[in-house]
Amino acid sequence: MASNNVAQFAAELKMPAGVLLEQLQAAGVQKASEDDALSETDKARLLDHLRRSHGSNDADKRKITLTKRHTSEIKQSDATGKARTIQVEVRKKRTFVRRDEAAEQAAEATGNGQEAAEDLELQRREEEARHEAELLEKQAQELKARQEQLAREEAERQAREQAAEAERRRAEEEAAKKRAAAVAEAAAAAREQAEQERASQDEERAAAERAAQREAAKKAEDAAREQAEKARLEQEEIAKRRAKAEAEARAIREMMNTPRKAQVKAPEPPPKPAEAPKPAEAKGTLHKPARPAGETSARPAAKKPAPAAAAQPAATTQPAGPGGDKKKAGGKGGWQDDAAKRRGIKTRGDTSGGVDRGWRGGPKGRGKHQESTTFQAPTEPIVREVHVPETITVADLAHKMSVKASEVIKVMMKLGQMVTINQMLDQETAMIVVEELGHHAVAAKLDDPEAMLVEGEASDAPQLPRPPVVTVMGHVDHGKTSLLDYIRRAKVAAGEAGGITQHIGAYHVETPRGVITFLDTPGHEAFTAMRARGAKATDIVILVVAADDGVMPQTKEAISHAKAGGVPLVVAINKIDKPEANPERVKQELVAEGVVPEEYGGDSPFVPVSAKTGAGIDDLLENVLLQAEVLELKAPVEAPAKGLVIEAKLDKGKGPVATILVQSGTLNRGDVVLAGSAYGRVRAMLDETGKPTKAAGPSIPVEIQGLSEVPAAGEEVIVMPDDRKAREVALFRQGKFRDVKLAKQQAAKLENMLEQMGEGEVQYLPLIVKADVQGSQEALVQSLLKLSNDEVRVQIVHSAVGGISESDVNLATASKAVIIGFNTRADAQARKLAESNGIDIRYYNIIYDAVDEVKAAMSGMLAPEKREVVTGMVEVRQVFKVPKVGAVAGCMVTDGVVKRTSSVRVLRNNVVIHTGELDSLKRFKDDVKEVRQGFECGMSVKNFNDIMEGDQFEVFEVTEVARTL
């Protein structure tokens, strides 16, 4: 339709006619009313004006676009609880357009018109607002009036009811008064009539009650009968479905057990009209679908299974969602059937006409006999008893509850924690999740890990011969390391601090007669535990005894370790090249210790050797290999590795490093190992020369990296099948170790408290010990604890492997401890912090230097010993009584010297009657500091006046003497 006037054009543009008139006036087209005609020229002028006003008609106009960027940072915690900094950038964009002068003039020209139009628009809007306000006020008044009217009506109704109630009560009272008067006038007749009426009323009421009871009983009986009928129908329906499912499962088993060629197509049953199943009403929240067909149910089984169910081929039962049976009720397969067929098991040789072939359907017309399967939701929520171990993943927890992992993740999100499907949950959190989902959580203790490890020990791998593990033991400085150096052609002893071995060294040597693995143990008395570990891991012990020194304490200890472990001994009498060597004396001393040489009828070969010249080394190796042949050492090679931690340390760059002796099996790089409470994957494996190796067989020492923490020396190393089992056993052991440690600390606190109560104040020397390897740290701590006595005790605040860090200095500041670094150093930050806090850090590389200095420090903490030294004897010649002073003795110094600061004992007939201090010492009338032998003096004793002639004063001084441990 052509728009000839303003109103029609406004309707075409879908805008108010008044706004269009304002725009036409602004464009210079003078139109006064909506009925004014519009020409094409007027429309063109309006379009040109609108284009100019919006800046789209001038090609020469220039635009300036300004973009402001503002960057800020926010901190947000991720799922693991770590704070992450996120960069946030805010961009603001503004565009400025420079208009031409003609547009500005036109804008100025039309400014007055626009202002007028704006005034009109403002007035119109004010009028509309005023009108709306009036309407609102009117509505509020009407509402208020209606509420008042309702209130008045309610008050009137209540008043009427109250009046009616009062009138009724008044009438009742009057009637009662009249009845009372009537009863008073004719008591006998009224009483009889009242009794008859009451009896009739009671009979009527009793009859009504009996009728009501009969009606209620009838209704209850009908309801119970209906409920029982419904329950019976449900039980029959469930029994039919269970029988049908069992028949289908039996058919599946028979089909799977029958050879493919022998399978014959089952006869097709006549088509039956499908019945729409009754949808069961689910009560509560269900977290698992219905029971599988083969699962034993607590409900009674069906008495009459469907006869045709066994002959039918099995159909894949798929749980349907809510309302999933709508399409199946009519007997025709819907989208649920298609999805079931696509998800079905594709079985080759199936004769079911394509029911279970997925998208590979059979020939046409064969799929008509398939039956629609329905999901019957359980009528009660299934509450499961979930056993929760100490750690469990989200996926495993969901599997235990038979729910989807997303449900567990949702519950964790409600609890305020973001988790993934593979994230580990602790036992407490997992139990909360189980309770949130409506199940019963039970804290399940892990099975005994040792039992699990024992079960895994059985291996069918063949036993193959393995090299012997030989431990070299003996007293300190008897030449053990030098002997090994000659065998290995190395120079280890020259580089050891103080010339003594303080670590266990593990080496394997390839000799012409075979491979031998040597363990070099320390001989110092502090390393008892190290030597015990060496004897535990060994097959043969070489006992090194110096020919010029004989049997020493650590030699006896090594003999006892070897006997306790049942390990054969090979005695090497070293240093036979020295002039003062006496091998025969050594033999006699060893016989006294129970080590009898073969030449005396014993079983221990004695080999004289010299680590300096190499004499007798070949004979020693030959005897060792001979003993190994007698022992017939064998171990499986193609099996998971088992071994022993010989030594462990914390490297600053590599992390925890452990020296392991493989005892059986093969340790490969990448295996998951468990060592005590430490576990991890072997990231790198080095031999004793520092070269990387990929595998280590039995009796081969290697150094591995990748453990979670520094293991304790002497722990057993086992290769685990996966990270999860290793982590579970390690956490189990950590918990046990923590409980034992806390119990020991509690017992120690109680013991210390009782001892302090009984013996008074005890001095403590707090120490923090940091060592390079686990064995040295253990030996140093044990040696320092042995220095404790009843008055001064060593308190090990903290001991660990690794360098001295800031946390150690902070701990020393809090506990006022001294830090001892054994073959370790403090980093720059720790040194600065120690200097600022005045913490003493001592460095040692020889163990007995550390022990001696701590012993000296403890000696300084001992209370000094007080000793009395008699300096003189005085004889009382005369006694003077001085007022306000007391008794003053005139004395003669018969021996020694008397000092003013000395103490005295008063002797009478050589019996001590008083011990005290001098109050004054005078010679003539002058106070003096001392009086020597042969001079007279006047003396008074503090707080003692019972002085008689002939008494003697024994003068003595108390001196303090420093004590030593």
From Swiss-Prot:
It is found in: Cytoplasm. The gene is infB. One of the essential components for the initiation of protein synthesis. Protects formylmethionyl-tRNA from spontaneous hydrolysis and promotes its binding to the 30S ribosomal subunits. Also involved in the hydrolysis of GTP during the formation of the 70S ribosomal complex. Residues 499-503 are annotated as: G2. NCBIfam families: IF-2, small_GTP. Residues 610-612 are annotated as: G5. This is Translation initiation factor IF-2. Residues 94-375 are annotated as: Disordered.
